């Protein structure tokens, strides 16, 4: 399966880069992985609701421009559906069985995703009702994708 992760923002922390690189290496035996980093829009403090929407729309247009037309799109969204690791593994397996060879995960910037991006998503996935830094979510997502492949292949992985 081809998996792309479209993310707004760059990774600055070395410890996150190391973890991300480790899971990219581990995933290379299971899938073709592409991480597409997009520049985030500069957002000053104390934005109005309208200014937030403008920034999300600008980032959203960049995101939409990177989604392949045939991809099944999973947007990470706080209001999405929460899944266990086993349920994510089953979802990914079911998508492959149904002929989806391209899966695209989307991680928005600090303000979240635009309505247009959420509208394009085939599925909204929530890892928690809590908010996490989007850089950290990249590492957590990669770990969960790796765990899903291990589960689907009947391979041991710590719980």
Curated annotation (Swiss-Prot):
It catalyses: pseudouridine(1915) in 23S rRNA + S-adenosyl-L-methionine = N(3)-methylpseudouridine(1915) in 23S rRNA + S-adenosyl-L-homocysteine + H(+). Pfam families: SPOUT_MTase. SUPFAM superfamilies: alpha/beta knot. InterPro entries: Alpha/beta_knot_MTases, RlmH-like, tRNA_m1G_MTases_N. Gene3D superfamilies: 3.40.1280.10. It is found in: Cytoplasm. GO terms for molecular function: rRNA (pseudouridine-N3-)-methyltransferase activity. Keywords: Cytoplasm, Methyltransferase, rRNA processing, S-adenosyl-L-methionine, Transferase. One of its GO terms (cellular component) is cytoplasm. S-adenosyl-L-methionine binds at residues 76, 108, 127-132. Its EC number is 2.1.1.177. The keyword DNA-binding does not apply. Homodimer. HAMAP family: 23SrRNA_methyltr_H. Belongs to the RNA methyltransferase RlmH family. Specifically methylates the pseudouridine at position 1915 (m3Psi1915) in 23S rRNA. This is Ribosomal RNA large subunit methyltransferase H. It comes from Clostridioides difficile (strain 630). The gene is rlmH.
């Amino acid at each position: 399966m081809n998996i792309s992760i479209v993310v707004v923002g760059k990774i600055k922390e070395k410890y996150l880069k190391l973890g991300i690189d480790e899971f990219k290496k581990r995933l290379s035996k299971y899938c073709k992985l592409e991480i597409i980093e997009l520049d985030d829009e500069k957002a000053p403090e104390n934005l109005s609701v309208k200014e937030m929407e403008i920034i999300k729309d600008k980032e959203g247009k960049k995101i939409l421009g990177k989604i392949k037309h045939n991809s099944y799109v999973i947007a990470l969204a706080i209001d999405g559906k929460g899944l266990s690791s086993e349920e994510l593994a089953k979802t990914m397996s079911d998508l492959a069985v149904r002929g989806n060879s391209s899966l695209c995960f989307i991680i928005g910037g600090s303000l979240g995703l635009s309505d247009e991006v959420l509208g394009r998503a085939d599925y909204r996935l929530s890892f928690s009702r809590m908010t996490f830094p989007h850089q950290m979510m990249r590492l957590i997502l990669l770990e969960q994708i790796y765990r899903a492949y291990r589960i689907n292949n009947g391979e041991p992985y710590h719980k």
